[in-house]
């Protein structure tokens, strides 16, 4: 399943980490465009108060880890998109170009189902998306999350801390699924 990740998902690392960990495990395929990554860079600089070089380095590392995720030549699809906020048309265009089924975003109101259905797309919150991937592949997803948690050094964290932070960051369904699996 190919999922276009919206720029707002890259800002909190506690959210992008599980998404990319499940992708690294082969449970989903992420997609984005240069414009999505540029929006993510600007948001990271603003929210995390880091310089451009640091935000760029973070996103460049993600792009190197997932070289097939970059949707190219999406611009030709943008004029056909009719959203209430025309600044979001590029997200739909990139999703179409990438062959995505899903746009994963916190801004669900910006991606109405009737417009997305014209392109065979739907939008999901990261909570619903992560939970659906977990439900489709529970053992593999749990293994990926264990690897993620054990890899964290700055700061180190336990699975319980990971679950609690995900809950706080508006991922309650996914946090509950992890908690139920851990026991």
Regions found by a protein language model. Name each.
Residues 1-17:
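Metal-dependent nucleic-acid phosphoesterase active-site entry motif
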Residues 8-9, 35, 109, 128:
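Alpha-helix/helix-capping structural signal
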Residues 13-47:
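PIN/NYN-family metal-dependent endoribonuclease catalytic core
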Residues 34, 75, 125-127:
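Residues at the C-termini of beta-strands that transition into short coil/loop
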Residues 43-65, 136-147, 151-152:
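Extended, non-globular alpha-helical segments
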Residues 67-102, 136, 156, 167-183:
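Active-site neighborhoods of divalent-metal-dependent phosphate/nucleic-acid chemistry enzymes
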Residues 88-122:
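Acidic, metal-binding active-site segment of PIN/NYN-like and related structure-specific nucleases
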Residues 109-183:
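Acidic, PIN/NYN-like endoribonuclease modules and their adjacent C-terminal/linker elements
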